[in-house]
Amino acid sequence: MSGRGKQGGKARAKAKSRSSRAGLQFPVGRVHRLLRKGNYAERVGAGAPVYLAAVLEYLTAEILELAGNAARDNKKTRIIPRHLQLAIRNDEELNKLLGRVTIAQGGVLPNIQAVLLPKKTESHHKAKGK
């Protein structure tokens, strides 16, 4: 017989995405496509999109974690751009990474210069009282 037909052949395994193989939520296939189409290099290795997707996922998780904490501190259950701004600007490393980034509707960090604050005069009151 000519080896055709289904009798004896192995069943094809269920397709498994590269994201699930790498244990990631971010799409490795899409990142690979964007790297190829973006004219960053003539060729793109198999590990590059996995690594880049992992880095993007980590940064996103880090920012969302801090933004969720900022939302909880403000007694809110929904993250808004203000919470993202507070999360990024209060974290030294993220602030350095995203220093030139403007977040729409993010506002600014509350900051009052020390010289503008009212002076403490308690020591003078005690001295005059004696």
From Swiss-Prot:
The modification N6-(beta-hydroxybutyryl)lysine is found at residues 10, 14, 37, 96, 119. The modification Phosphoserine is found at residue 2. It comes from the Eukaryota. GO terms for cellular component: extracellular exosome; nucleoplasm; nucleosome; nucleus. The modification Citrulline is found at residue 4. It is found in: Nucleus; Chromosome. Residues 1-22 are annotated as: Disordered. Deiminated on Arg-4 in granulocytes upon calcium entry. GO terms for molecular function: DNA binding; protein heterodimerization activity; structural constituent of chromatin. The modification N6-crotonyllysine is found at residues 37, 119-120, 126. The modification N-acetylserine is found at residue 2. The modification N6-glutaryllysine is found at residues 96, 119-120, 126. This is Histone H2A type 1-C. The gene is H2AC6. The modification N6-lactoyllysine is found at residue 10. The modification Symmetric dimethylarginine is found at residue 4. The modification N6-acetyllysine is found at residue 6. SMART domains: H2A. Core component of nucleosome. Nucleosomes wrap and compact DNA into chromatin, limiting DNA accessibility to the cellular machineries which require DNA as a template. Histones thereby play a central role in transcription regulation, DNA repair, DNA replication and chromosomal stability. DNA accessibility is regulated via a complex set of post-translational modifications of histones, also called histone code, and nucleosome remodeling. It comes from Homo sapiens. The nucleosome is a histone octamer containing two molecules each of H2A, H2B, H3 and H4 assembled in one H3-H4 heterotetramer and two H2A-H2B heterodimers. The octamer wraps approximately 147 bp of DNA. The modification Phosphothreonine is found at residue 121. Keywords: Acetylation, Chromosome, Citrullination, DNA-binding, Hydroxylation, Isopeptide bond, Methylation, Nucleosome core, Nucleus, Phosphoprotein, Ubl conjugation. The keyword Nucleus applies. Changing residue 2 to A: Blocks the inhibition of transcription by RPS6KA5/MSK1. Belongs to the histone H2A family. Coiled coil: none annotated. GO terms for biological process: heterochromatin formation; negative regulation of cell population proliferation.
